[in-house]
Amino acid sequence: MKIENDNSQLTIEMPKRTALDREDFLVNARNKSAVEFIDNFYKEPIKRGILIGPKGCGKTHLVNVLCKSLEGINWSFLSSENRDIYNIFNANDVLIIEDINNFNSKQKEDFLFHSINLSKELSKALLLTSSLKVSKLNFKTLDLVSRLEAMNTAFIEEPDDTLMEALIIKLFNDRQLLVKPNTVNFLMQRIERSYLGVSEIIELIDKVSLSQKKSVSIKLIKALID
């Protein structure tokens, strides 16, 4: 730990700690249905679904919440690099495949198609995540598309102002940075209304603040984005 002190504010440099527990996820109308989807995922009769939302919206966070809730239940992440997925399915009750929007080859489509079929054949839970809706995925395998369209889906929408403010504060807190309310308000008026946009600007502010040994302030932010 390293402590820096200028004339206006004491700042403490500490490693970034991303809060990924259930209570750390910021819930409002833009993502409430997705949170309920995850909370109830393993309780549903048909345990197959897709969590859809823009980059940086917290899909991995919610997947982490699900995994932590599965006490005594075997689960595993799957990737298209796995060679023996049949044995992986047999050894686990819940399988997770993230970022299917990045599947851009026939080999990866075949892997996903086979995984969906195995989840049905072996009665295993299967959770997929994607930053694009199924209709926007450029898959060539029509049978795969039809299977995806038949799955339960939950959506996370881009943040409104209330969620934006809470997200900014959380991301600063993850980095152990204390920021005044007027600084948060100033930042909100000047950045892209997206999860990824918020994450990227907070990352930049953090790096500049540390490199210049300055506290996060309106003056520092203004120099970066105005």
Language model features with spans:
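Short conserved motifs of the RecA-like P-loop NTPase core
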Residues: 178-191
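Post-Walker A helix-loop "phosphate-sensing" segment adjacent to the P-loop in P-loop NTPases
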Residues: 68-78
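A short, basic N-terminal segment
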Residues: 1-40, 210-226
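Conserved AAA+ ATPase "sensor/coupling" helix adjacent to the nucleotide-binding pocket
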Residues: 165-177
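Conserved nucleotide-sensing/catalytic segment adjacent to the nucleotide-binding pocket
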Residues: 88-129
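Conserved AAA+ ATPase "SRH/arginine-finger" region at the nucleotide-binding site
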Residues: 136, 140, 151-163
